Amino acid sequence: VELQNRLSDESQ
């Protein structure tokens, strides 16, 4: 899922 990946990346 690219959406979750992006959210995870922004969280860090």
From Swiss-Prot:
- Function per UniProt: Acts as an adapter protein linking the dynein motor complex to various cargos and converts dynein from a non-processive to a highly processive motor in the presence of dynactin. Facilitates the interaction between dynein and dynactin and activates dynein processivity (the ability to move along a microtubule for a long distance without falling off the track). Predominantly recruits 2 dyneins, which increases both the force and speed of the microtubule motor. Component of the FTS/Hook/FHIP complex (FHF complex). (Microbial infection) Serves as a target for the spiC protein from Salmonella typhimurium, which inactivates it, leading to a strong alteration in cellular trafficking.
Chain coiled-coil ranges: none
Q: What is its main location?
A: cytoplasm
GO cellular component, alphabetical, reads: FHF complex; Golgi apparatus; microtubule
Q: Kindly state which keywords UniProt assigns to this record, in alphabetical order.
A: Cytoplasm, Cytoskeleton, Golgi apparatus, Microtubule, Protein transport, Transport
What molecular functions are annotated in GO for this chain? Answer: dynactin binding; dynein intermediate chain binding
Subunit organization: Self-associates. Component of the FTS/Hook/FHIP complex (FHF complex), composed of AKTIP/FTS, FHIP1B, and one or more members of the Hook family of proteins HOOK1, HOOK2, and HOOK3. May interact directly with AKTIP/FTS, HOOK1 and HOOK2. Associates with several subunits of the homotypic vesicular sorting complex (the HOPS complex) including VPS16 and VPS41; these interactions may be indirect. Interacts with MSR1, and this association is stimulated by ligand binding to MSR1. Interacts with microtubules.
Family membership:
Belongs to the hook family.
Q: What is this protein called?
A: Protein Hook homolog 3
Kindly list the places in or outside the cell where this protein is found, as annotated in its UniProt entry.
Answer: Cytoplasm, Cytoskeleton; Golgi apparatus
Q: Name one GO biological process term.
A: early endosome to late endosome transport
What is the phylogenetic placement of the source species in the record?
A: Eukaryota, Metazoa, Chordata, Craniata, Vertebrata
